[in-house]
Structure formats: structure tokens, C-alpha cells
UniProtKB/Swiss-Prot annotation:
Protein name per its UniProtKB record: Adenylyltransferase and sulfurtransferase UBA4
Positions with a binding annotation for Zn(2+): 180, 183, 257, 260
Origin species: Yarrowia lipolytica (strain CLIB 122 / E 150)
Protein keywords: ATP-binding, Cytoplasm, Metal-binding, Multifunctional enzyme, Nucleotide-binding, Nucleotidyltransferase, Transferase, tRNA processing, Ubl conjugation pathway, Zinc
Any one annotated GO CC term: cytosol
UniProt pathway annotation: tRNA modification; 5-methoxycarbonylmethyl-2-thiouridine-tRNA biosynthesis
Annotated GO biological process: cell budding; cellular response to oxidative stress; invasive growth in response to glucose limitation; protein urmylation; regulation of pseudohyphal growth; tRNA wobble position uridine thiolation
Length: 396
């Protein structure tokens, strides 16, 4: 930004260009120039530059946050672009660098730092240092607990959101004596019950709404809207409900909380030395459940695909409708797991099972074997088939 003819003075606390850039929001009585000056002096850390981080970063940058740090070790994929519009034209570019590039073009009045690393127990405290607020734009329980614990011990509030399919939720943690994430969720959900956008799907506008809401709540926090009175809440959004928005009160800070309680059991030393094992705490479903004798590679299956056999596709129906093998039979794993017998005549034919990535298909083979039906899992599922056998097969 060329400020040679627009330097700040005692009369003008901002550069002339900033008055023109932020004028419309400074006209809002609840915000004003005092709010703009507040934002101008603040530093925000955004963890995750994906579906939530993409809109949040765009609107925070536009609003004039003084500095934004973006940490994400992932790269942009084509499947991201329907909802992560900040990355347009940047497939295969690190997300944090792509987002920082967008910020630099959108608002040269602020500064931005991209970090192409994964947030971990060994670096979280150094990453958080010097920031006024953290936006949790991640999609996994383990990293959410890490963000929470680091924020509590660093004295930094967190604006956290999530989105899946057509629904989203948002809350503020560790602010003004309110609860932290562990207060509300002391025990993580079962690992097998956790879905990501890649598993369950996501509507772009839904995650966009949640990311923009994070940006708005961040602005309110940083400009003192909640400073006098703050009632902890959980904001819920459901795109196909009417009305789509509702807000509910949540429990207060828990005195017995492991992170922010009266006698906390989590410390910086325990985190940095790996004694708080977030992966173990949250669990992780095993990726290999079956012995090799019960599995077959996509290449091996390609040699028998034209022979007589039964192919069960255990994906959910919407995924099956997107693409499938000819003559495959769809029995979703969510249904098969409860069956006491198979609704398909096997008649001695070999049975093979496929899913999207080769996880549910292993569970299905294990179930079929318990029902007395010999079967084999196709390793890596349809994704591996498209990658290793048929490049024309659509992946999603």
C-alpha cells in the first residue's frame, strides 16, 4: 500500500485509504470508527483454511483485522472449490498460501502470515502466541481438543464452528469466564460415529454461512460487544428447517473440567511432551480390519470383473446414485450391520464388497463372514479403482 500521501496524523488515526475502504461499516452505530480501530490493532489465528476458514478469512480480511495468521498443511483439491471459493485457480497449492494470496489482493492495508504446517502439541503454543483470538475452522475432534487446551492455557478465546450436510453449529469458548470446549464435551464422540465433509457431504452455502458467522462473532468479540455481559450459547443452523436458525443456552464453566476447572489436570508441559495423547483420547478407527486372505486389490478384481460373481456396494444410496459398477447391488453398511441374513441369493457365487475408500467394506465383509457368507473386500474401494485401474471412473 502506497501511503506516501496519506500518512496518519493525530487527527486521522488511520490512513486516508482506510476511511474509504471501511467507510460503510464505520457508518453502523454499533461499530463506528472505534470498532474499526479495535480491529485494526488485533491479531487473529485461523486454524484451517478449508470450508469454514475460506469464508471466515475473506470477511475478516475485508473487515480490516490488523493481522491474520493462517495455519493449514493441506493442499487445494478440485473437490474443495464448490465451497472453498477463496482458492479459485489454485488447485495443488497449499491452502494457507492460497488463502494468504487472496488476502493480499483483497486488502493491502492488513498483514497476513501463512503457515504450511499441521497444528500439533509440539507447536501449538508457539503458534498461538501473540494472537488475540483463535478461529477453530477444523473438522476433527482431536485437533479441536488441542486447540481448546492450548487456548485455555494461553488465555485466548476461541470461536468454533462445524458443518456437515445441511447443518452447522457455532459457539464461543474460553471467553469472559464462560465454558471451554471440554466443559461441553468432556468425552469425545465414538471414532466410528465421526463424519467429515468427505464422508457425509456438505452443501457449500451451509459451510459458508457458518464461516461468515464465525467472522461476525469474531468482530463482535474483538470490538467489545460481549465485554459487559456474555451468556454462553450454541448457535444452530439447519438449511432445510424453518426457521433455519436457533440459539440455545449451554452449560456454564465446569469446576471439574480437565482444562479450565478449578484444579486443571492438563498443563502446557503435559501437552508439549506428548503426555496428552489426543489421538488416543479421541480414538481412531482401524484402517485394516481384515487379513489379506479376505481382501483383493483393484487390479486383481479387474481380472475377474467379467466373471460370474456378486458385488455388494455398501455406500449410502445418494453415493451409489452418483456412480457405481454395473450390476452391483447396493446394501448400505448402515442397514447391513443390523441384518441377520442377506437379502441376496448367493448360490455359491463369489461375493466381493466395495465402498468409497475401503473402510465400510471391511466392516461389511466381517459381518458377512459372521453370517456364514464367504466374501472379500476390494482394497481402497472405488477411489483406488479409479486411481489404479480405470482413470475414467468418476471420483467425488
Amino acid at each position: 500500500m502506497d501511503r506516501s500521501d496519506s500518512e496518519k496524523t493525530d487527527v486521522l488515526p488511520m490512513f486516508k485509504q482506510e476511511y474509504g475502504r471501511y467507510g460503510r461499516q464505520m457508518l453502523v452505530p454499533e461499530f463506528g470508527i472505534s470498532g474499526q480501530l479495535d480491529l485494526r490493532s488485533k491479531r487473529i489465528l485461523v486454524v484451517g483454511a478449508g470450508g469454514l476458514g475460506s469464508p471466515a478469512i475473506q470477511y475478516l480480511a475485508g473487515a480490516g483485522i490488523g493481522h491474520i495468521t493462517i495455519i493449514d498443511d493441506d493442499t487445494v483439491e478440485e473437490s474443495n472449490l464448490h465451497r472453498q471459493t477463496i482458492h479459485a485457480g489454485n488447485v495443488n497449492v497449499p491452502k494457507s498460501e492460497s488463502a494468504a494470496e487472496f488476502v493480499g489482493k483483497l486488502n493491502p492495508c492488513i498483514s497476513v502470515t501463512p503457515m504450511v504446517v499441521r497444528l500439533s502439541p509440539s507447536n501449538s503454543f508457539s503458534v498461538f502466541e501473540g494472537h488475540d483470538l483463535v478461529l477453530d475452522c477444523t473438522d476433527g475432534p482431536a485437533v479441536r481438543y488441542l486447540i481448546n487446551d492450548t487456548a485455555v492455557l494461553s488465555g485466548i478465546p476461541v470461536v468454533s464452528a462445524s458443518a456437515l450436510k445441511t447443518e452447522g453449529q457455532l459457539s464461543i469458548y474460553n471467553y469472559n469466564g464462560g465454558p471451554c470446549y471440554r466443559c461441553l464435551f468432556p468425552i469425545p464422540p465414538p471414532a466410528d460415529a465421526v463424519q467429515t465433509c468427505g464422508d457425509g457431504g456438505i452443501m457449500g452455502p451451509v459451510v459458508g454461512m457458518m464461516g461468515m458467522s464465525q467472522a461476525m462473532e469474531a468482530i463482535k468479540l474483538l470490538t467489545g460487544v460481549y465485554s459487559e455481559s456474555f451468556t454462553p450459547f450454541l448457535m444452530l443452523y439447519s438449511a432445510y428447517n424453518f426457521p433455519p436458525w436457533k440459539s440455545v443456552k449451554v452449560r456454564k464453566r465446569q469446576k471439574t473440567c480437565a482444562a479450565c476447572g478449578d484444579v486443571p489436570r492438563i498443563s502446557r508441559q503435559l501437552i508439549e511432551t506428548g503426555q496428552v495423547d489426543y489421538s488416543e483420547f479421541c480414538g481412531s478407527p482401524s484402517q485394516v480390519l481384515l487379513g489379506e486372505e479376505h481382501r483383493i486389490t483393484p487390479e486383481e478384481y479387474s481380472k475377474i470383473v467379467s466373471t460370474k460373481h456378486i458385488l455388494l456396494d455398501v455406500r449410502e444410496r445418494p453415493q451409489f446414485d452418483i456412480t457405481s459398477f454395473p450390476r452391483s447391488i447396493n446394501i448400505p453398511w448402515s442397514e447391513l450391520k443390523h441384518k441377520e441374513e442377506l437379502d441376496v441369493q448367493v448360490d455359491g457365487s463369489p461375493v466381493y464388497v466395495v465402498c468409497r475408500y475401503g473402510n465400510d467394506s471391511q466392516n461389511a465383509v466381517d459381518k458377512l463372514q459372521k453370517l456364514g457368507i464367504p466374501s472379500k473386500d476390494i482394497k481402497g474401494g472405488l477411489y483406488a479403482w479409479a486411481k489404479n485401474v480405470d482413470e475414467k471412473f468418476p471420483i467425488y
